[in-house]
């Protein structure tokens, strides 16, 4: 989307609503803890210090988040895409887990950036329907900041195998994550009504161009496990969700065309793989490194816009796309109390 917004086109997404399938799949998630608890029907709930472990780590966050615009009246073709890229943002990460009984554990985890981090944003438009594969307008914003990013995760695990040197279990949980960006200054190449890529210029340095926020909410299911040999331990977790609810907010700050775009997407897919390796420096303390890859796949959703200058609004379907992927690396300490 151009910063001067030459055209205000109608946008959005129609999500096919399948109540039966959605209820069935969500039911699997909600009943997983009940099924897991059957393994522990004869166990007594005990709260002792030996049942609690916590970890804290420092690391980096890198990735890319994307927003897309589709034109429903032209068959839903993509007419705009903004790519927000970020690298090596410093984060702090923590978790606490409580083994309620040998077969059941509950946990909470989360991470947050320690400050803003420089990034990059590229905004491209494909406005010529007769040549949809060639972009007509582009702006680049190397002065882009990841203002903040964070995530929290609440989960329950049911251990199918739980021995001193190895564990394997099913898990279910709820997770939310947020990202915020601001793009300033930059340069552009636009196409006028009479020409092609014939309008070239730049925006004032430091001037806000676009602000963007994403939020992801999801229940999920997964598989987790670990294996220990002497003082070395390897672990891994896989998580999946088909019920991601994503939303975003795009603020165009051009004084001449001050517009807010808001989009919502439902039932997106989420995949996450995490692997860690650690060494026990004492019987209760382990140092470890971990890598985690996460992805929310693109899907169309509903969009609304509000023009602050003339106080008008619009709403349309099949016009928005939201996507995110990131990679987290951390090193930290885990301690069992």
Regions found by a protein language model. Name each.
Residues 54-62, 108-114, 170-178, 225, ...:
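Transmembrane beta-barrel strands of outer-membrane/channel proteins
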Residues 12, 20-39:
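Gram-negative bacterial Sec-dependent N-terminal signal peptides
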Residues 102-108, 163-168, 231-234, 283-287:
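Repeated loop/turn-to-beta-strand initiation elements of outer-membrane beta-barrel proteins
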Residues 94-98, 152-158, 172-174, 221-227, ...:
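Residues on the lipid-exposed face of transmembrane beta-strands in outer-membrane beta-barrel proteins
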